[in-house]
């Protein structure tokens, strides 16, 4: 299924039904009083978070969503039927933004969470409502209210516990497939991953969700590469796992490239707990691995976990550490 994380839609509440002008007319009551009923209310527009959804694809090809109008009132004081509410299911993590994108109207962060964004119009009043001691046969009614309407943006920010970051071809997708049942596309060239991928890790009777986003390059926060479009999907994560390809040159420069991009995009990303890994260690000798650890760790003042997604070396220890950090946060 195509991954869509942004959509602009028009939503409108249903119109209220008109009130009715009617008079009681029966065989032996030729001049009965007013009995016009009120109109029904228009339907509301309701958003609901659904954990079974992970894309806004349903809003790509349909842009206008209208709730049902209320029915007009009728004689014998019958109130018109209210319009049916329109329920729009969106993935958990969807933000509803104003048309200019400057205001977050609501953030759906839980499964089953509901938000009534627009109320339908109220039904009009029938002539029974206007009967009084000085006006026994009113011919007055009111029309139903027009339902409110607006354009809104839907922005999806995936919910995960752990976000994977790194340069293109750092081994993020291979790592995700090694620790979860996710099956992202894997190939030996940059930008294999074109959309975010989610996977669930099960360890020691616990579980956590991992998000893999397309690789970052210098200038990602300015729109270079694919990172700018997808960095938002790790804004909600609790921990960042930073993967460095041990076979690459300039490891220190590569490390700071990613750190700079995270800082430039969002201070909240910069301040998240970071766990650093060397990937593809199965291609290097123990001497080379140790040499690079001793070279880099003192400079950045961080522990680096050497791992291999191919042989599973170091994976168990890394996952245990991730779980420990998650339990602290």
From Swiss-Prot:
Protein name: GTPase Obg
GTP-binding recorded as keyword: yes
Every Obg domain range: 1-159
GO biological process entries: ribosome biogenesis
Recorded GO CC terms: cytoplasm
Keywords linked to the UniProt accession: Cytoplasm, GTP-binding, Hydrolase, Magnesium, Metal-binding, Nucleotide-binding
OBG-type G domain boundaries: 160-327
Subunit structure: Monomer.
A GO molecular-function annotation: GTP binding
Listed cofactors: Mg(2+)
Subcellular location: Cytoplasm
NCBIfam families named among the record's database cross-references: Obg_CgtA, PRK12297.1, PRK12299.1
EC category name: hydrolase
Amino acids binding Mg(2+): 173, 193
Family matches, as InterPro entries: G_OBG, GTP-bd, GTP-bd_Obg/CgtA, GTP1_OBG_dom, GTP1_OBG_dom_sf, OBG_GTPase, P-loop_NTPase
Primary residence: cytoplasm
PANTHER family for this protein: DEVELOPMENTALLY REGULATED GTP-BINDING PROTEIN-RELATED, MITOCHONDRIAL RIBOSOME-ASSOCIATED GTPASE 2
Family per similarity comment: Belongs to the TRAFAC class OBG-HflX-like GTPase superfamily. OBG GTPase family.
Functional summary from the UniProt entry: An essential GTPase which binds GTP, GDP and possibly (p)ppGpp with moderate affinity, with high nucleotide exchange rates and a fairly low GTP hydrolysis rate. Plays a role in control of the cell cycle, stress response, ribosome biogenesis and in those bacteria that undergo differentiation, in morphogenesis control.
UniProt cross-references to Pfam families, sorted A to Z: GTP1_OBG, MMR_HSR1
Record-linked PROSITE patterns: G_OBG, OBG
Organism name: Orientia tsutsugamushi (strain Boryong) (Rickettsia tsutsugamushi)
E.C. number(s) listed in UniProt: 3.6.5.-
Residues annotated for GTP binding in this entry: 166-173, 191-195, 212-215, 279-282, 308-310
């Amino acid at each position: 299924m195509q991954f869509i994380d942004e959509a602009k839609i028009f939503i409108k509440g249903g119109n209220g039904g008109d009130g009715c002008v009617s008079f009681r007319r029966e065989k032996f009551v030729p001049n009965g009083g007013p009995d016009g009923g009120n109109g029904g209310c228009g339907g509301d527009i309701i958003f609901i978070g659904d954990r079974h959804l992970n894309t806004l694809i349903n809003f790509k090809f349909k842009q206008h969503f209208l709730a049902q109008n209320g029915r007009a009132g009728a004689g014998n004081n019958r109130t018109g039927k209210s319009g049916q509410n329109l329920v729009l299911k969106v993935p958990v993590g969807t933000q509803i933004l104003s048309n200019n994108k400057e205001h977050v109207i609501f953030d759906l962060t839980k499964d089953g969470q509901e938000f009534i964004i627009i109320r339908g119009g109220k039904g009009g009043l029938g002539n029974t409502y206007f009967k009084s001691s000085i006006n026994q046969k009113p011919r007055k009614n009111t029309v139903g209210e027009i339902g409110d309407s607006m354009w809104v943006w839907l922005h999806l920010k995936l919910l995960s516990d752990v976000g994977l970051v790194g340069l293109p071809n750092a081994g993020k997708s291979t790592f995700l497939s090694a620790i979860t049942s996710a099956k992202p596309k894997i190939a030996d060239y940059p930008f294999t991953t074109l959309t975010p991928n989610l996977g669930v890790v099960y360890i020691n009777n616990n579980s956590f969700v991992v998000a893999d986003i397309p690789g970052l390059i210098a200038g990602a926060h300015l729109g270079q590469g694919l990172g700018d479009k997808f960095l938002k999907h790790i804004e909600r994560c609790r921990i960042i796992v930073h993967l460095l390809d041990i076979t690459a040159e300039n490891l220190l420069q590569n490390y700071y490239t990613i750190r700079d991009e995270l800082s430039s995009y969002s201070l909240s990303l910069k301040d998240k707990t970071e766990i650093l890994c060397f990937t593809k260690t199965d291609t290097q000798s123990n001497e080379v691995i140790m040499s690079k650890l001793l070279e880099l760790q003192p400079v950045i003042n961080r522990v680096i976990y050497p791992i291999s997604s191919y042989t599973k070396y170091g994976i168990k220890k890394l996952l245990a550490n991730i779980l420990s950090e998650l339990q602290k946060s």
